[in-house]
Amino acid sequence: MSTAQLVVQHLPYLRRYARALTGSQVAGDAYVAATLETLVNEPETLGRSTNVKADLFRVFTRIWNSLSVNGHSDQVQHDLPAEVRLGQITPLPRQAFLLSCLEGFSEEDAGVILDVDVSKVRDLVDEAGRELAADMATEILIIEDEPLIAMDLEALVEGLGHNVIGVARTRTEAVKIASESKRPGLILADIQLADGSSGLDAVNDLLKTFEVPVIFITAYPERFLTGERPEPAFLIAKPFQPANVSAVISQALFFQQSARRREAHNA
């Protein structure tokens, strides 16, 4: 398989990381586009190692950090929404946290990507975990038709200090629970539900009445990370690792709370 084919193979996961880092599909995809443009113009930046995925993320990180400070790409800046201002100052600990917990990179690979040593990666991940866990407990609605997965998710989020207001197996149940319970501060949603209904449709129904961050869970993430249509900013692949879910929940709540603080400040 050629290097170009390997890069294409890893793009869905780079998009996932970029969107989690910025909290936005538009912003994340803009940084990915800038990374691909760099690879086209400067193919030598990818290096000659056998770990193409780590090299791809390393190039992305270089672009991310340079644009965050200098904003030298007018095209990318014009594509970025207002909320990406927060993403542009996302600290190094959060990058280490997502690389390790969301993308599953080893400490060694995360160190190469971030240009730090392994001990620094460990310190950064620990720091991010403390930072993101602070003062973020919320009510969570789970939309999942597989009982065992629903039980795992419920135990996981409660272990993080959150409260599950209900578990829905269908679109109709999700709307009913949301209308009869305390408004959720976060939704975890499968995409394909038991009765053939869609978790996407269930979420869209709920978002008509209130705004809430949503994390989608699917066995086919590549179908929803093509960059060709409106897509989830937060996506977890099945089978999932508890650390992945924890990382994405923390990130989603972080961006939600930061957005509210900015709104209050600007009011």
From Swiss-Prot:
GO biological process: phosphorelay signal transduction system
Domain named Response regulatory: residues: 139-253
Disruption phenotype: The growth rate of the phyR deletion strain is the same as in the wild-type strain when plant colonization is mimicked in vitro in the presence of succinate and methanol. However, in planta colonization experiments show a severe growth defect of the phyR deletion mutant.
Organism expressing this protein natively: Methylorubrum extorquens (strain ATCC 14718 / DSM 1338 / JCM 2805 / NCIMB 9133 / AM1)
PANTHER family associated with the record: RESPONSE REGULATORY DOMAIN-CONTAINING PROTEIN, STRESS RESPONSE REGULATOR PROTEIN 1
SUPFAM superfamilies: CheY-like (SSF52172)
Gene: phyR
KW Phosphoprotein (keyword) present: yes
InterPro entries documented for this protein: Bact_response_regulator (IPR050595), CheY-like_superfamily (IPR011006), PhyR_sigma2 (IPR053866), PhyR_sigma4 (IPR053867), Sig_resp-reg_PhyR (IPR014605), Sig_transdc_resp-reg_receiver (IPR001789), WH-like_DNA-bd_sf (IPR036388)
Function (record text): Key regulator for adaptation to epiphytic life (leaf colonizing) of the bacterium. Positively regulates several genes including katE, sodA, hsp20, dps and gloA. However, it is not known whether this regulation is direct or indirect. Also induces several dehydrogenases.
UniProt-recorded name of the protein: Phyllosphere-induced regulator PhyR
